[in-house]
Amino acid sequence: MRYITAGESHGPQLTVILEGVPAGLTLAAEHINKELLRRQKGHGRGRRMQIEMDTVEIVSGVRHGMTLGSPITLIVKNDDFKHWTKVMGAEPISEKESKEMKRTITKPRPGHADLNGAIKYGHRDIRNVLERSSARETTVRVAAGAVAKQILKELGVEIAGHVLEIGGVKAKHISNLSIEEIQIITENSPVRCLDKTVEQEMMDAIDNAKSSGDSIGGIVEVIAEGMPIGVGSYVHYDRKLDAKLAGAIMSINAFKGAEIGVGFEAARQPGSKVHDEILWDEEQGYTRKTNNAGGLEGGMTTGMPIVVRGVMKPIPTLYKPLASVDIDTKEAFQASIERSDSCAVPAAGVVAESVVAWELAHALVEQFGKDRMELIQQNITQHNKYAKEF
């Protein structure tokens, strides 16, 4: 499976085309809209989320609530486009009209794609960069992830995400929660945190950053249960599932690091405390005493829960802007301000769930049969029986 997204932040719409989704998957707009709404929530979101009420339109690949096996096209309209029709229109305009609009941006913002993108593509108006590099694009990545989650659900895999840290405020580790319990707790938390004792402290940190014109980042974790043993591969570097998951996390706007299992903590512990001892019993088959590997060894699943974390830097659009240089005059200046969040970590956790779900669904479809859901389900059932008796 693969997908491609298109659209600008203030353009008419965002589009994603999904290829390789098996036939026979139950899919309706309500499945996707539920995920889009989750992305819009979270303490610290900016005014854009009050403008947009994201809903999806399914325009191909689905008939009567069932996928056809052909490419699926999903569209999310930008309600704010009505205020940007001239600025973001596709038709040519004169230089005079361009100047009269006064929307040309020549001051790159530190931490954004602005300067590097302008140099790469030769844009003298940085708006041509920021419109596409905006995290608004993650709207349709979440839509794609919603389709992947539906695949996982029908294949017996559950997934959930939560926030571990915001602005240096850390949640306590809470274990032995089911995926359903994690989902219920986080959906009722303004910061998607499992630890209620630090919830208010996280919100205060966000509010303090906002009042001072600053922004803060954090850490999110995604957990998936029900993956069969041996999904992925050790044979080639580009087929290792952990590499794909890390790449997916790092592809999210403003994410600067990824961990699987105990992650970087493994460098501080001896091997005897890091590696997961193998157990076997008649009911479960092969299992592990611990899950420090985060459900992945040698690029393949171990049958234990998948545990992936991502680090999000503070959003670089600040209301107390940092120093920059005008690309036209070369004079020092304060970077331009676009409408932005003070903290998007809770929302980014939903995006992280989506990209992890896509990679897991892709791996299952690739390994167990690409054409139709019924065949994939049968093959996974046979594989699980084989692995248990191995």
UniProtKB/Swiss-Prot annotation:
FMN binds at residues 132-134, 253-254, 298, 313-317, 339. This reaction introduces a second double bond into the aromatic ring system. This is Chorismate synthase 1. It comes from Bacillus anthracis. Keywords: Amino-acid biosynthesis, Aromatic amino acid biosynthesis, FAD, Flavoprotein, FMN, Lyase, NADP. Reduced FMN (FMNH(2)). Pathway: Metabolic intermediate biosynthesis; chorismate biosynthesis; chorismate from D-erythrose 4-phosphate and phosphoenolpyruvate: step 7/7. Homotetramer. Belongs to the chorismate synthase family. The keyword Flavoprotein applies. Its cofactor is FMNH2.
